[in-house]
C-alpha cells in the first residue's frame, strides 16, 4: 500500500490545523473504530477543524491527495455506527470543536449553530438567557450533536418533533472545497434567510441530509415557544392487541392537530431496559427474558404490556381542559387506564409516591419526573441510552459511553403507515423474530406526524460475550429483511445497511450517482454513505 499520499495529506492538515488537531494516536483511532456492534473499517487519522474555513482547507487537501474524509459531528451516533466510516481507510473529520452558537432571535424563534453544538449546550444557552423558547430534544445523550441528528433525520419530542421540517439557511462545504448557502441565505443581507424554508429556486437543503454531497457547517433551527401551561397524559394497555385500535385513534387525533406534541408507545421490553438491567441470576443465565420475570418487572407500571404517553401544551388552562376532553373521549374506551397529570396532580404524586410504591409496587416518582422534566418541554434525558447497558453484568457508569463500555446496541427504524393494521403487522414481525433469535424486542412507536409512525427497535446485548455480535446482527438482518418484504423500509440506516435496501424501481440511483460524480468527482467525501452506489449505472453511461 502506498502511504505517501496519506503522509503528505497529514503534513498539510497539520500545517492548517496545528499538530494538536491531527491525531494518529493508536488508542484514539481504536476508539473511533469502535461502535456498539462489530465493525471492520480502519481509520488512519482523526482531524478536527475549528471553523468552516478550516473545513474548506481540509477538503481541498483531501482532494489534492486523494484521501477520503468521513465527517462526524460529536460522533455519538450510537446504535447506527457511532463514528465508524462507511468505507475502509477514511480519515475521520470531527466537527466537535465547531461548537459556536452563531445567531439567536427570541422574537422570531430561531437559532443558528455549528455542528459541534450539543443538546445540553443549546438547552443551557436558552435557560441562561431566560428564553421562553425550547428545542425539540431526542432520546439520545444530551451530549450528542443537534445538527448531526438532524442531518441523519432523527426525530425529537414535543412540537417540531419532525426536526428536519424545521430548519433552513444551511451552510455547506462542498467536496471541491467551495462553500454553499441554501435558500435566501445565499443573498447578502436577505432579511428572511433564517425564517423562510424554501428561498427562491430549487430547494437544496435535503441534498445535504442523509448524504455525502457536502459537510454542513452551519444550520438555522426553528425553536418553539415554551408552553404557559402543560399537562402530560399516559395510558396502559394490558393486551398488546389493543395497540392497533389505539394507533388509529392517535392518527385521527393527530390529523385534527391534537395533541401538538408527539405521542409515543413503549412496550414492556423497552421499559424494563430503561429502568434496570437484565436479571441474570433470576433468569439462571438464560435468554431471552422469561415471561414470568417480565411479568414481575411489569409491576413497576401496573402490569401493562404497553405504556403510551404524550403532552398537552397550551396557552391557558381552558385550552388544556378542552384538549383533555377530546383526548379522553377518544382514548378512554380503548385503554386500560388513562391518566392526566397537571401541576396539582404532580404535587400530590410527589407526596404519595413512597406509600403507593410500598403498597402497590407502582412507582409514582416516574409520574413526577415525567411532568417536571418532560422531554416535551425541551428537557433532554439519558435513560434511553442507559438501556444500552441492559444485558451488561456491570452497572452503567456515571458517565455512559456505550462504545467504550462494549455495549451491544443495534437500532432498526422502520417507517410504517399510521394505521392499526400496518403497525400491528410490523410489531408482530419484530416481536416474533427477535424472540426467535433470543433477544428482547425493545420497541418504541413514535407518532411525530399525522400519517406515519416511526418504529424504533432496540436490540441490546453484551459485546464482551463471544458470538453475540454475530447473533445480534443475524437477528437484525432477519427483521430488516422481513419488514422490507412487507414494504416497511427504515427511515434511517446504520453503516452496516447502506446497501441493504431493496432494488429501486426508478432512476433514483442514476440521479444520486450523477450528483455525486458532479459534486465529488474524486469520491473523497464519505464514500458509501447514503449514496446507494450499487444502483449507479457505469460512469461511461
Swiss-Prot record:
SUPFAM superfamilies: FAD-binding/transporter-associated domain-like, FAD-linked oxidases, C-terminal domain
Source organism of this protein record: Chondromyces crocatus
Gene label: cndG
Function statement: Oxidative decarboxylase involved in the biosynthesis of the antibiotics chondrochloren A and chondrochloren B. Catalyzes the decarboxylation of biologically inactive pre-chondrochloren A and pre-chondrochloren B to yield mature chondrochloren A and chondrochloren B, respectively. Cannot decarboxylate free L-tyrosine, 3-chloro-tyrosine or a number of chlorinated and non-chlorinated analog substrates containing variable N-acyl chains.
Phenotype upon gene inactivation: Inactivation of the gene results in the accumulation of carboxylated chondrochlorens A and B (pre-chondrochlorens) and abolishment of chondrochloren production.
Regulation: Activity is not affected by the addition of EDTA or/and EGTA chelators or in the presence of external metals like Zn(2+), Mg(2+), Mn(2+) and Fe(2+). Activity is inhibited under low oxygen conditions.
Protein's pathway: Antibiotic biosynthesis
Substrates-to-products reaction catalysed: 1'-carboxy-chondrochloren A + FAD + 2 H(+) = chondrochloren A + FADH2 + CO2; 1'-carboxy-chondrochloren B + FAD + 2 H(+) = chondrochloren B + FADH2 + CO2
Name the UniProt record assigns to this protein: 1'-carboxy-chondrochloren decarboxylase
Domain of life of the organism encoding this protein: Bacteria
PROSITE patterns: FAD_PCMH (PS51387)
Entry's Gene Ontology molecular function annotations: D-lactate dehydrogenase (cytochrome) activity; D-lactate dehydrogenase activity; FAD binding; lyase activity
Phylogenetic placement of the source organism: Bacteria, Pseudomonadati, Myxococcota, Polyangia, Polyangiales
Record keywords, A-Z: Antibiotic biosynthesis, FAD, Flavoprotein, Lyase
BP-aspect Gene Ontology terms: antibiotic biosynthetic process; lactate catabolic process
Membrane-spanning ranges: none
Chain ranges of the FAD-binding PCMH-type domain: 39-226
Induction text: Encoded within the chondrochloren biosynthetic gene cluster.
EC number: 4.1.1.129
Amino acid at each position: 500500500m502506498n502511504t505517501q499520499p496519506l503522509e503528505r495529506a497529514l503534513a498539510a492538515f497539520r500545517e492548517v490545523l496545528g499538530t494538536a488537531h491531527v491525531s494518529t494516536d493508536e488508542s484514539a483511532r481504536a476508539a473511533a473504530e469502535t461502535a456498539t456492534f462489530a465493525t471492520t473499517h480502519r481509520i488512519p487519522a482523526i482531524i478536527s477543524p475549528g471553523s468552516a474555513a478550516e473545513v474548506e482547507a481540509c477538503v481541498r487537501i483531501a482532494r489534492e491527495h486523494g484521501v477520503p474524509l468521513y465527517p462526524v459531528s460529536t460522533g455519538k451516533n450510537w446504535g447506527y455506527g457511532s463514528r465508524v466510516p462507511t468505507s475502509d481507510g477514511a480519515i475521520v473529520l470531527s466537527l466537535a470543536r465547531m461548537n459556536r452558537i452563531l445567531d439567536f432571535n427570541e422574537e422570531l424563534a430561531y437559532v443558528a449553530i455549528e455542528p459541534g453544538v450539543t443538546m445540553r449546550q443549546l438547552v443551557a444557552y436558552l435557560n441562561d438567557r431566560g428564553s421562553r423558547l425550547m428545542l425539540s430534544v431526542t432520546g439520545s445523550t444530551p451530549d450528542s450533536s443537534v445538527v448531526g441528528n438532524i442531518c441523519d433525520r432523527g426525530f425529537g419530542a414535543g412540537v417540531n418533533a419532525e426536526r428536519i421540517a424545521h430548519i433552513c439557511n444551511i451552510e455547506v462545504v462542498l467536496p471541491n472545497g467551495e462553500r454553499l448557502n441554501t435558500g435566501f441565505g445565499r443573498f447578502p443581507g436577505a432579511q428572511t434567510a433564517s425564517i423562510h424554508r424554501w428561498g427562491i429556486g430549487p430547494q437544496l437543503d435535503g441534498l445535504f441530509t442523509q448524504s455525502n454531497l457536502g459537510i454542513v457547517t452551519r444550520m438555522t433551527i426553528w425553536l418553539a415557544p415554551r408552553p404557559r401551561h402543560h399537562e402530560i397524559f399516559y395510558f396502559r394497555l394490558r393486551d398488546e392487541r389493543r395497540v392497533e385500535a389505539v394507533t388509529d385513534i392517535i392518527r385521527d387525533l393527530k390529523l385534527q392537530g391534537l395533541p401538538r406534541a408527539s405521542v409515543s408507545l413503549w412496550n414492556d421490553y423497552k421499559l424494563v431496559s430503561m429502568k434496570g438491567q437484565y436479571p441474570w441470576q433470576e433468569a439462571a443465565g438464560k435468554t431471552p427474558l422469561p415471561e414470568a420475570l417480565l411479568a414481575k418487572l411489569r409491576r413497576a407500571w401496573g402490569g401493562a404490556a404497553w405504556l403510551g404517553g404524550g403532552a398537552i401544551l397550551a396557552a391557558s388552562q381552558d385550552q388544556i381542559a378542552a384538549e383533555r376532553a377530546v383526548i379522553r373521549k377518544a382514548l378512554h374506551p380503548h385503554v386500560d387506564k388513562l391518566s392526566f397529570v397537571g401541576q396539582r396532580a404532580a404535587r400530590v404524586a410527589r407526596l404519595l409516591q413512597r406509600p403507593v410504591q410500598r403498597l402497590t409496587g407502582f412507582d409514582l416518582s416516574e409520574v413526577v419526573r415525567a411532568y417536571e422534566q418532560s422531554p416535551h418541554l425541551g428537557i433532554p434525558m439519558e435513560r434511553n441510552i442507559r438501556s444500552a447497558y441492559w444485558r451488561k453484568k456491570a452497572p452503567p457508569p456515571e458517565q455512559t459511553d456505550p462504545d467504550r463500555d462494549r455495549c451491544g446496541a443495534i437500532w432498526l427504524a422502520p417507517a410504517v403507515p399510521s394505521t392499526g393494521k400496518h403497525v400491528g403487522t410490523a410489531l408482530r414481525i419484530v416481536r416474533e423474530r427477535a424472540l426467535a433469535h433470543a433477544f428482547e424486542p425493545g420497541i418504541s412507536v413514535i407518532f411525530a406526524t399525522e400519517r406515519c409512525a416511526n418504529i424504533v427497535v432496540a436490540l441490546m446485548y453484551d459485546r464482551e460475550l463471544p458470538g453475540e455480535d454475530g447473533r445480534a446482527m443475524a437477528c437484525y438482518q432477519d427483521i430488516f429483511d422481513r419488514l422490507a418484504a412487507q414494504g416497511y423500509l427504515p427511515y434511517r440506516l446504520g453503516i452496516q445497511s447502506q446497501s441493504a435496501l431493496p432494488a429501486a424501481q426508478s432512476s433514483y440511483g442514476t440521479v444520486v450517482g450523477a450528483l455525486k460524480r458532479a459534486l465529488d468527482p474524486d469520491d473523497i467525501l464519505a464514500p458509501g454513505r447514503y449514496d446507494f452506489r450499487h444502483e449507479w449505472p457505469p460512469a461511461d453511461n
